[in-house]
Amino acid sequence: MITLIATLKVKDGSLDEAIRILKEIVPQVKASEPGCLEYIPHTVRGDDKTIIFYEKYSDKDALKLHSANLMKNMEKLFPLLEPGMDIKTCFEIIR
């Protein structure tokens, strides 16, 4: 099991549009990537620029498939984002 925590920053005034786009993207990812077990974007209270993704993949191959599809799935969102993402790869200790 592989978990990613990805933090993205949207440009000023772009959060509502980013959320609208994510409501399209997330179901597509879940439908087309069976090894993607969780793909949940979050906002942060009091911060209108941050989106945090909680992502869980069954194995390395599932993560590779997601990475290969990332540009296509996120092409509408990328213009709304500030440069750079903070991505942390996590591994479960206890379940």
For the regions a language model picked out, list residue spans one by one:
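A short acidic, often aromatic-flanked loop/helix-cap motif at beta-alpha or helix-coil junctions
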Residues: 47, 93-95
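Short, surface-exposed ligand-recognition loops at beta-strand->loop->(often short) alpha-helix junctions
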Residues: 10-17
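Absolute protein N-terminus
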Residues: 1-2, 95
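Short, well-ordered beta-strand segments in beta-rich or mixed alpha/beta enzyme
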Residues: 2-9, 38-67
